[in-house]
A protein has these predicted regions:
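Hydrophobic transmembrane alpha-helices of multi-pass small-molecule transporters
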Residues: 1-42, 193-217
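Membrane-interfacial helix-loop connectors
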Residues: 97-156, 235-309
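Transmembrane helix exit motif
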Residues: 21-29, 66-72, 162-188, 208, ...
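Membrane-embedded alpha-helical segments and adjacent helix-loop junctions characteristic
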Residues: 30-99, 103-106, 202-259
Length: 332
């Protein structure tokens, strides 16, 4: 484990060194008047995305370490109802109470599924955690001038959509879709450490968290780089101009949410800036789709789950969000 962490640390150091050399090298003269301003903006956006996401990723990997060392498969099986319908509801409701963003929730779900949680239950947790947790709903309420309508619609429609997607995943996938095998999560787990003293178990928890952080961190960086590139070099107005009519504007706002990869605790303030330009349905597309799926989150999901599963989940989220919002439009 230490060897792996050290190798990841070397990789991070190498990447950081390359970026520093690129930034400070005096010989760079590629269209300097344009390049310097654009690169400075790119740099600021990239750092802001990392600063937004890192606290939640750190929280996520710490919880992942606790699950790995202190939670056994037997304890986990008692938590999830055997009835699939109840399990779907339970996973979505528990996720809704957990203050995590779409980045921090990925390592937690990977650990839970790896320890024996049904895949569909993990998906329910994955979808509702970043979307309708108390912090997100409160920030939505504040962003729209203390108007409860958008906040309530985000919560209710988001929960309905998450349950629908979870049910479809339950029907489509019966096997574990993690890239790592189940045994990879059981080594040095609670069954082997139950008789060991607490300090030893705490050390194991921290080692697991560090290993998880370096494993997920590089994919967060890749996603943040791509999202920063989009925000810097692609004008938001040019994206919005693509939308025409209710369906078009909703699809454009969903696409914008995917590309911008905003933290779910802050995305409502961006959506509120379009309040007088677009219908509420389109704004809800931005608010619901983004926390479920965005660019940096997709990179992290691809590092954890099999490609076919991630693509299927992407299609299900996109189609379900759009369909439910269009059906609910007369009531919005």
């Amino acid at each position: 484990m230490r060897t792996r962490a050290n190798s990841e640390l070397i990789g991070f150091a190498f990447l950081g060194s390359c970026l520093l050399l690129f930034y400070f090298h005096k010989g760079i003269r590629l269209n300097e008047s344009f390049f310097s301003d654009s690169f400075l903006t790119f740099n600021m956006v990239f750092i802001s995305i990392l600063l937004e996401a890192l606290p939640f990723v750190l929280l996520g990997v710490m919880i992942s370490g606790i699950i790995q060392v202190f939670v056994s498969e037997e304890q986990l099986s008692k938590f999830i109802p055997r009835n699939k319908f109840l399990a779907i509801i339970m996973s979505c409701l528990v996720g809704a109470l957990f203050p995590a963003c779409e980045c921090g929730i990925v390592p937690i779900v990977r650990r839970l599924v790896g320890k024996g949680m049904p895949l569909f239950a993990g998906v329910g947790f994955l979808l509702t955690g970043p979307l309708i947790n108390p912090l997100v709903i409160f920030s939505t309420y504040m962003a729209f001038g203390e108007d409860t309508k958008i906040a309530l619609l985000r919560m209710v429609l988001g929960l309905i959509i998450a349950m629908m997607i979870t049910a479809m995943i339950c029907a489509l996938f019966q096997q574990n879709q993690l890239k790592l095998t189940k045994n990879s999560f059981n080594s040095n787990g609670p069954e082997q450490q139950v008789k060991q003293p607490l300090p030893t178990r705490l050390r194991a928890m921290i080692e697991h968290a560090i290993d998880e952080f370096f494993d997920m961190g590089k994919f967060l960086i890749i996603g943040a780089v791509l999202a920063a590139f989009v925000q810097t070099f692609i004008a938001t107005k040019s994206i919005l101009d693509l939308g025409n009519g209710l369906v078009g504007s909703t699809l454009v706002m969903m696409g914008l949410a995917y590309l911008l990869s905003l933290c779910s605790e802050a995305d409502a303030f961006i959506a509120a800036s379009f309040d007088h330009l677009l219908p509420k349905t389109s704004l809800l597309g931005f608010l619901i789709y983004g926390p479920m799926l965005d660019l940096k989150n997709t990179i992290m999901l691809l590092s954890v789950f099999k490609f076919r599963f991630v693509m299927t989940l992407t299609i299900l989220i996109t189609v379900t969000v759009l369909a439910v919002l269009l059906l609910a439009h007369p009531m919005i």
